[in-house]
């Protein structure tokens, strides 16, 4: 199951989405191989040689989170050559397996703790933008910490509490 792809990557341009499950993958001019795990996908990509066919694309057969729809996406070969000639999932713009946007240990006295966030909180939205996975959560936190910005409203689900809590978080620039 995949997390949010890197912005402007081959994966994002092909419409890979957070929580898509990879069923099979391979070159468009060859057979697709079954994928059992993130490591399996990584291995397939790394063992594959770049196609000599200029029109070849890397194909992912994906199943939506609800398990209903299966679709095929085709990723165009990125313009930059892979590092050391090895085609990794990251080269295609895939960031890793899906993980829930749940807060882990908080920095004592840090911004999150001061705002009232707690370990185990599930972040649903930040400033009305959906947070589909841990990758998207980390990207949002990094972006807000890059420079001082206005307070943000985080919508979180907390164990033992019905509904969503609205928590105002004041980002601080991190050196």
Spans of model-derived segments:
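PDZ peptide-recognition modules
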Residues: 1-175
């Amino acid at each position: 199951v995949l997390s949010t792809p890197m912005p402007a990557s081959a994966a994002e341009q092909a419409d890979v989405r957070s929580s898509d499950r990879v069923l099979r993958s391979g070159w468009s001019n060859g057979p697709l191989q079954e994928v059992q795990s993130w490591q399996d996908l990584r291995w397939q990509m790394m063992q594959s040689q770049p196609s000599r066919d200029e029109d070849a694309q890397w194909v992912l057969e994906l199943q939506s989170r609800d398990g209903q729809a299966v679709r095929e996406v085709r990723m165009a070969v990125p313009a930059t050559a892979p590092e050391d000639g090895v085609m990794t999932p990251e080269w295609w713009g895939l960031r890793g397996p899906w993980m829930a946007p749940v807060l882990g240990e908080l920095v004592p006295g840090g911004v999150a703790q001061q705002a009232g966030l707690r370990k185990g909180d599930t972040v649903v939205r930040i400033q009305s933008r959906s947070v589909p996975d841990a990758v998207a959560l980390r990207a949002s936190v990094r972006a807000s910490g890059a420079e001082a910005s206005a307070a943000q409203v985080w919508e979180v689900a907390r164990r033992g509490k019905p509904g969503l809590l609205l928590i105002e978080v004041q980002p601080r620039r991190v050196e």
